[in-house]
């Protein structure tokens, strides 16, 4: 067994994903999810060596109780494995401009994460609760913060500055930050290996497609543009998020239709996207089923989703200058051969030609090139953000 194991924690507002990852191989020794925090049926599910387990956490429990369960029940039952854990790695959604790389957590870092909470009000406060809980449960282990926004700090100003008064950026930090950076970093790195090119000479466009979705242009291993903005709302059509809209729609909804700003925020984040267009579901699998059955709303939602994505991919050839590959990842990107084919067919001007057999084979965790031999390359790379967090954690504590 490796002596480079890391406990990776990803704390949401009402859930906590966790895994014990081998930083050398990326394999998970333990993985699980605690959910329904604050409700009567808070519970935890986990898997060890393929064997599934489940337990109640008790009514109205939260992050602290979940971390204590992981320590006192799950890891206590695996003493040999637990003894090999070298660090606790935390996924942090928003690091603003304060954090351009992963860092060992101390009180200064905690303060910085707190100061970025206004940019990720649903996520950063939950991350801080998880950090405090992990510090209490693992007082002797170093804690590491890995930021979703850090990978995008290489973007030039022309990519991240909005065409608003510059003082809003200078005084308030209003700019494009981007998300899914850890995923885009991992798959762009893996894509270079598939292409058998040095990362510094590889230009790819990565599409991380899940309930949240973003596209990033990666030039020589560095992010040069990305679709999400100040928050995860900008960019692509997503499960329940609208992505790009005319900003004046907000004014119209408030002043003409009587919405409050809170209602508008809820509308754009939780009632729009695939769900809003289809009036059916936010789940892409349900959208594809509706499309196959001729459901008008599902068909329209699928077409808009693919069209918006194709437009973004096309536009990101501009900062790259040369395109080596398009990379699909995330739950939708890794599993929807329908969406991949539709998007690439819209991009035939760039000489994309889908190989149907390869495309259908690249599902359920399988990676590979999905285009014909005479085509510009498109591929599927299953993401592994936890591995990046584990790697960064080990690198930092062994410096």
Curated annotation (Swiss-Prot):
- Recorded GO CC terms: cytosol
Q: Which SUPFAM superfamilies match?
A: Actin-like ATPase domain
Top-rank taxon, per record: Bacteria
| Record field: catalytic activity | acetate + ATP = acetyl phosphate + ADP
Q: Which UniProt keywords apply?
A: ATP-binding, Cytoplasm, Kinase, Magnesium, Metal-binding, Nucleotide-binding, Transferase
Q: In which pathway does it act?
A: Metabolic intermediate biosynthesis; acetyl-CoA biosynthesis; acetyl-CoA from acetate: step 1/2
Q: InterPro entries in the record, alphabetically?
A: Ac/propionate_kinase (IPR004372), Aliphatic_acid_kin_short-chain (IPR000890), Aliphatic_acid_kinase_CS (IPR023865), ATPase_NBD (IPR043129)
Amino acids binding ATP: 17, 208-212, 283-285, 331-335
State the active site. Answer: 148
Q: Which cofactor does it need?
A: Mg(2+); Mn(2+)
Which Pfam families does its entry note?
Acetate_kinase
Q: Which CDD domains match?
A: ASKHA_NBD_AcK_PK
Keyword check for Transferase, yes or no: yes
In the Enzyme Commission scheme, what number(s) does this protein have?
Answer: 2.7.2.1
Q: Which residues bind Mg(2+)?
A: 10, 385
Q: Name one GO molecular function term.
A: magnesium ion binding
Q: How is the cofactor bound?
A: Mg(2+). Can also accept Mn(2+).
> tRNA processing: present as a keyword of the record?
no
The family assignment reads: Belongs to the acetokinase family.
How it assembles, according to the record, is: Homodimer.
Protein's job = Catalyzes the formation of acetyl phosphate from acetate and ATP. Can also catalyze the reverse reaction.
Name it.
Acetate kinase
Organism (species): Shewanella oneidensis (strain ATCC 700550 / JCM 31522 / CIP 106686 / LMG 19005 / NCIMB 14063 / MR-1)
């Amino acid at each position: 067994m490796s002596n480079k194991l890391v406990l990776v924690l990803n704390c949401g507002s009402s859930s906590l994903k966790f895994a014990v990852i081998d930083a050398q191989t990326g394999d998970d020794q333990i993985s699980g999810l605690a959910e329904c925090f604050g409700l009567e049926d808070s519970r935890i599910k986990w898997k060890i060596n393929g064997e599934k387990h489940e337990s109640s956490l008790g009514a109205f429990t939260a992050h602290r109780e979940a971390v204590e369960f992981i320590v006192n029940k799950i890891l206590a039952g695996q003493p040999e494995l637990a003894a090999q854990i070298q660090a606790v790695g935390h996924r942090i959604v928003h690091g603003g401009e304060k954090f351009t790389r992963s860092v060992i957590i101390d009180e200064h870092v905690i303060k910085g994460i707190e100061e970025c909470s206004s940019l990720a009000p649903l996520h950063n406060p939950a991350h801080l609760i998880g950090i405090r809980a992990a510090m209490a449960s693992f007082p002797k282990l170093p804690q590491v913060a890995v930021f979703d926004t850090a990978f995008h700090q290489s973007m030039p100003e022309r990519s991240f500055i909005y065409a608003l008064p510059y003082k809003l950026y200078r005084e308030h930090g209003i700019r494009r930050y981007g998300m899914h950076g850890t995923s885009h970093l991992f798959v762009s790195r893996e894509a270079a290996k598939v292409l058998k090119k040095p990362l510094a000479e590889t230009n790819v466009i990565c599409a991380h497609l899940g309930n949240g979705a973003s596209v990033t242009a990666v030039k020589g291993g560095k992010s040069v543009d990305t679709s999400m903005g100040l928050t995860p709302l900008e960019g692509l059509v997503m499960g329940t998020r609208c992505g790009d809209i005319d900003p004046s729609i907000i004014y119209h909804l408030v002043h003409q239709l009587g919405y409050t700003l809170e209602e508008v925020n809820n509308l754009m984040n939780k009632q729009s996207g695939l769900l809003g267009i289809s009036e059916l579901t936010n789940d892409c699998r349900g959208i594809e089923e509706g499309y196959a059955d001729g459901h008008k709303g599902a068909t329209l939602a699928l077409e808009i989703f693919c069209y918006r994505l194709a437009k973004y991919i096309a536009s990101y050839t501009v900062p790259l200058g040369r395109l080596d590959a398009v990379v699909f990842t995330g739950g939708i990107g890794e599993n929807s051969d329908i969406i991949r084919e539709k998007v690439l067919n819209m991009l035939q001007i760039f000489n994309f030609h889908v190989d149907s057999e390869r495309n259908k084979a690249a599902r359920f965790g399988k990676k590979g090139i999905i285009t014909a031999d005479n085509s510009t390359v498109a591929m599927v790379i299953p993401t592994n953000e936890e591995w990046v967090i584990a790697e960064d954690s080990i690198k930092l504590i062994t410096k």
